[in-house]
Amino acid sequence: MATLAERRRIARLVHRFGFGPRPGEFSNLLAGGFNQAAEKYLSVPSQDAFADNQDEPVVRDQGKRPAPNSPDVVSYATEKRAQLTSLSFWWLDRMVLSEHSLRERMTWFWHGHWATSYQKVDDALPMYLQNQSLRRNALGNFAQMSREMVNDAALIFWLDGQTNTVKAPNENLSRELMELFTLGVNRYSEEDVKETAKALTGYKIDKSSGQVNFYPKQHFSGAIKVLGTQSTFDASSLSDFLVARSDSALFITERIWYRFISTMNPLTDTSLTSSFASRDIAALVKAIGRHSALDNPDNSMVKSPIDWFVSASRALSITPSKFSNPNNIRNYLDLLGQRPFFPPNVGGWPADQAWLSTSSAQYRIQFATQLVKEADLSPISSLAPNARINGLADWLGVVEWSSRTKMALNGAIRDPARLALLALCSPEYVVSA
């Protein structure tokens, strides 16, 4: 039998670097031990039977919005909503059903890192193209990812890059490129912001198609001075220059640590950056996932709404797009404050204890009630009543129940639906160990 410490470590691995266990998976991982579990969860998958065969979302270039008095306005708006719905549930299905969830988990992390919202972009195709870029590079090379992102139509539009000209510089993209995407706070100067904005001129987008075009005559072609280095740059070479700096290696390591290990105990082991020397994301994730800090009982972390919903859906064998009323999923994710493709700002979503509130607890109960109605409860209902509480912990990947939670669960021991509902809303499940 696994020790409590081993159980905690594996539970954290499964919930933080995946999206929680499928029925029976946690018990199997416990039997194999942490090293075997880490090898499974932290390795880059070569194939994924579901993801490799999933149909693509129905998204296309709709062209420009029709004039307000055009007869095409209604059909245009209807298709726009349908495309967003298709894209959203396509990704939720991938999160829930992918056999190797690390890639989707990291795609979700990078979506929050390069936070871009449909709220402003207002076209599904460029959001889809960005999402595919993030997925393609999610466990690849960060230099390549950054290069693709500074040439990404959705991000450029989101941060007003298309209005950045030599005569009228717009510094939004240049500032966030350094502060939020590659270097971090206090690792650049205001003069660096002004200079890097020049390197990002000349890029124009066709938003509905997600295409980016470079116009050399509209680009500042002279030398600029950035972080003490004078040279000529375009968007890609500027990105390479920033990512190559040691500050960038430390910053990305800090960000992954913050989201996967602890928001309360900042990174102090800077030796982890050596795993990121070549900007290999997979190597860094593997090093962080095997770090001893994963064992620290103090490093608990509240599940975000997406983490909670996706992990619950995996346990309950629910496919989001096949939910009887998919709008309920969208509405509850909105109420809980986290919906794919809608980060609140360029800084992305909050983390950890920011997700705890009286209102969120009420919405979570209501949402869980809907989920349980459509769940496969056989992993619990098939057990004898006196085995259900322990079986429930193994089903959901919970470390252990508190005496208070056990008492509540005991009261529902003969009602599998209520038992599942109580467990999904319990502190032990809402908080990742």
Regions found by a protein language model. Give the residues of each.
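Short, compositionally biased low-complexity segments
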Residues: 8-16, 58-64, 79-82, 168-172, ...
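A ubiquitous short alpha-helical element
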Residues: 73-77, 115-117, 161-164, 240, ...
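Active-site substrate-binding loop specific to GH73 endo-beta-N-acetylglucosaminidase modules
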Residues: 67-69, 87-91, 123-324, 328
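Flexible, low-complexity segments enriched for small/polar residues
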Residues: 2-23, 245, 249-433
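Hydrophobic residues in alpha-helical segments
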Residues: 29-30, 41-42, 96, 134, ...
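N-terminal accessory alpha/beta regions
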Residues: 23-137
